[in-house]
A protein has these predicted regions:
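Amphipathic alpha-helical segments in well-structured domains
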Residues: 70, 106-109, 135, 160-164
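A structural signal for isolated positions on well-ordered beta-strands in alpha/beta enzyme cores
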Residues: 40, 146, 176-178
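Alpha-helical scaffold elements adjacent to nucleotide-binding pockets in ATP/GTP-utilizing enzyme cores
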Residues: 55, 115, 133-137, 162-170
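Cofactor-binding loop segments of dinucleotide-utilizing enzymes, especially the Rossmann-like FAD-
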Residues: 44, 124, 150, 182
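Canonical P-loop GTPase G-domain recognition
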Residues: 153-194
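Conserved G1/Walker A P-loop phosphate-binding module
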Residues: 1-99, 140
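Catalytic P-loop NTPase motifs of RecA-like helicase/translocase cores
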Residues: 98-99, 129, 155
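Inter-motif core of Ras-like GTPase G domains
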Residues: 102-126, 131-148
Length: 194
């Protein structure tokens, strides 16, 4: 790819039209050479994207808000895992996709996918039309995709299995699906014993 990119001869008009894509390609090539992996965490507002990243890095680095989503801009966080094949893994927190219109959502999905090596699409229930729309855009970009059903601790095991099957049945093609509880609910014992 590096050789192909170096040999690519484009006119100034073509450079103008393809400038953004070429910069993305150059960044991807640089990350490949430096053995860096970029994982985007994508989904609707309030599904627990930041909580999932906090759970993966094992510390509460990203702000989370119970009332509503709190991520306003993309933010990359290093994932402290060790691997002989990789020098660095970044987890990228993204704003909620349902805070923008359909056209903007499609552009954001494409931009996030093209700038990543893997996309985690996080949901906290069955797939909504917004999830499906984003999923189709992400799949069209050709990047590996993993769907994560977050907050899986909200359902008894049998209901969770049925929900996971419902999600799999609605996917446009074979996409891996996993359940997670990034910030599991913990029972609190009240002074009155309840």
């Amino acid at each position: 790819l590096q050789t192909w990119r170096q040999m690519l001869k484009l006119s100034s008009r073509e450079h103008g039209l393809l400038g953004g894509e070429l910069r993305l390609l150059d960044r991807q090539l640089q990350r490949l050479q430096q053995k860096e992996l970029r994982i985007a965490v994508f989904g609707r507002v309030g599904v627990g994207k930041s909580s999932l990243i906090n759970a993966l890095i094992n510390r509460p680095l990203l702000c989370t808000d119970v009332a509503h989503g709190s991520t306003r801009i993309q933010e990359a966080v290093p994932w402290p895992i060790t691997s002989s094949e990789l020098n660095r893994v970044d987890l990228v927190d993204t704003p909620g996709i349902d805070e923008i219109g359909a056209d903007g959502r499609a552009r954001l999905a494409a931009r996030v996918a093209m700038g990543s090596d893997l996309v985690l699409l996080v949901v906290d229930s069955d797939l909504t039309s917004t999830d499906l729309e984003a999923l189709k855009t992400l799949l069209a970009c050709g990047k590996p995709l993993q769907l994560v059903l977050n907050r899986s601790d909200r359902w008894p095991e049998q209901e969770q299995s049925a929900l996971l099957q419902s999600i799999r049945d609605r996917l446009p093609r074979d996409v891996p699906v996993t359940a997670a509880a990034a910030a599991p609910r913990r029972p609190v014992l009240q002074p009155d014993g309840s």
